[in-house]
């Protein structure tokens, strides 16, 4: 069964400016600019109202899979709005039983060096995605803080760090060493 029209709107806050170029969405805010291309999805994007403070996503004559993309695009745009206003922050903790994991940040927070993992001499180097800054927490021991505007780049950088410390050829129920995401949040606190 095909639905004639499915649509959804996203409210745009005052301090955020959104422009559309075809199916490319550009979001400008206090923390910077994010752009995302939705050309591969066959939907209509339009800005509503005199002040253009609402974004509407329309899908005509879609089946179930195609209608799901409407909500997906809205969620992506909401994440972009949240990124340019509040920013995203992931906190990661080092977990070790015996050999303390030594983490060093190089090149202004764009390269993470992991040493002494399970007592190995090999140095693991993880390059952060562009626009993601990594730092060592001052308040908490063995904690890394990743910050950026794009939730996908921040979470992907966290995944790269976690995957760099996978335990090979051992029983992973016993060897739980690694660097894991402990907290996900925003850089600035939302004004409730």
UniProtKB/Swiss-Prot annotation:
Q: Which residues carry this modification: N6-acetyllysine?
A: 121
Keywords in UniProt for this one?
A: Acetylation, Cytoplasm, Ribonucleoprotein, Ribosomal protein
Organism domain of life: Eukaryota
Statement: the UniProt record of this protein carries the keyword Acetylation = yes
Compartments, record wording: Cytoplasm
Q: Quaternary structure?
A: Component of the large ribosomal subunit.
Which protein family is named in the record? Answer: Belongs to the universal ribosomal protein uL6 family.
Instruction: Tell me the protein's name.
Output: Large ribosomal subunit protein uL6
């Amino acid at each position: 069964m095909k639905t004639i029209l499915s649509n959804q709107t996203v409210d745009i806050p005052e301090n955020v400016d959104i422009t559309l170029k075809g199916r490319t969405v550009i979001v400008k805010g206090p923390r910077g600019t994010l752009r995302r291309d939705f050309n591969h999805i066959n939907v209509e994007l339009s800005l509503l109202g005199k002040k253009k403070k609402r974004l509407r996503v329309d899908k005509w004559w879609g089946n179930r899979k195609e209608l799901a993309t409407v909500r997906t695009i809205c969620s992506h745009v909401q994440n972009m709005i949240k990124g340019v206003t509040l920013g995203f922050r992931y906190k990661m903790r080092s977990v070790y039983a015996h050999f303390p994991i030594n983490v060093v940040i190089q090149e202004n927070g764009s390269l993470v060096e992991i040493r002494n993992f399970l007592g190995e001499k090999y140095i693991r180097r993880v390059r952060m995605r562009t626009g993601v800054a990594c730092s060592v927490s001052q308040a908490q021991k063995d904690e890394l803080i990743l910050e950026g505007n794009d939730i996908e780049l921040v979470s992907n950088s966290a995944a790269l760090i976690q995957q760099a410390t996978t335990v090979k050829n051992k029983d992973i129920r016993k060897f739980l060493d690694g660097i894991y995401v402990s907290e996900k949040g925003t850089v600035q606190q939302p004004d409730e």
